[in-house]
A protein has these predicted regions:
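C-terminal accessory segments of proteins
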Residues: 1-239
């Protein structure tokens, strides 16, 4: 079982492990393993995973697709260091960027996709974090069992979009946002919130409204929205 911890509660060794592993992922091949993950996220013509780019289908796939995306990335991390994990940025409580990440400079050579040309991305941020979602808003969402899945994912994706925009810079560009290591911590927090809502017995059985073909989480066929429904089954939790 992998235990994902808050980015603000990592030991110095855990901080260094995360940075060392993603650096190793970004120095292996051409394109690097890290850049390949960025390319998957950017290829939204084939991998609808957001309401912004995929309409109703993308909105329904947003949470399960990114859950699988993070799991695949974390698995790749653990092939380099079995003790590695993706920390989460609890932005409604820790209303600042993780300080140990601030001095870390990162550059990714992003491969071309059908929608983007190849580019060199030097990660930058322009944080204006006063408007981050609040603890009260997130607590209300996590405990709101009156919502159906469509309502829940719509609200959570909206909060997610707000965080991307308030961090700014690389995170503010949906096509290249995974170049910023903060992306993984942000989406781990989104996934953590989702897992809390899913754990409420009143929400059991609430699932994305998708046809069988759209329920397949490409490019990871045969993964589907149902095979990633439980983080316990997937082998990780949030602590």
């Amino acid at each position: 079982m992998t235990h994902r911890k808050s980015a603000f509660e990592l030991t110095a060794a855990e901080q260094n492990r995360f940075l060392q592993v993603i650096t190793a992922m970004n120095t292996d091949n051409d394109p690097t393993l890290y850049a390949q993950f960025v390319g998957i996220h950017a290829d939204m013509r084939h991998h609808m995973h957001t309401g912004m780019g995929g309409g109703a289908v993308g909105r329904q796939r947003f949470l399960p697709w990114h859950r699988d995306f993070l799991l695949k990335f974390e698995t790749a991390m653990q092939q380099i260091d079995p003790a590695a994990f993706i920390p989460y940025w609890h932005w409604s409580t820790d209303r600042a960027l993780p300080p140990w990440l601030a001095e870390f400079n990162f550059t990714v050579i992003v491969p071309a996709t059908d929608m983007t040309a190849p580019q060199i991305v030097n990660v930058i941020r322009h944080p204006q974090l006063d408007g981050l979602p609040t603890d009260a808003q997130i607590s209300f969402l996590e405990t709101n069992s009156r919502m159906n899945y469509t309502q829940f994912t719509g609200v959570l994706e909206g909060y997610h979009n707000t965080v991307h925009n308030l961090v700014g810079g690389t995170m503010g560009d949906i096509m290249i946002s995974p170049c910023d290591p903060l992306f993984w911590m942000h989406h781990a927090e989104v996934d953590r919130i989702c897992s809390i809502w899913q754990a409420d017995p009143a929400n059991q059985g609430k699932r994305p409204a998708l046809s069988p073909i759209h329920a397949i989480l490409d490019p990871w066929d045969p993964d589907t929205v149902d095979t990633v429904a439980s983080i316990t089954t997937l082998g990780y939790d949030y602590v």
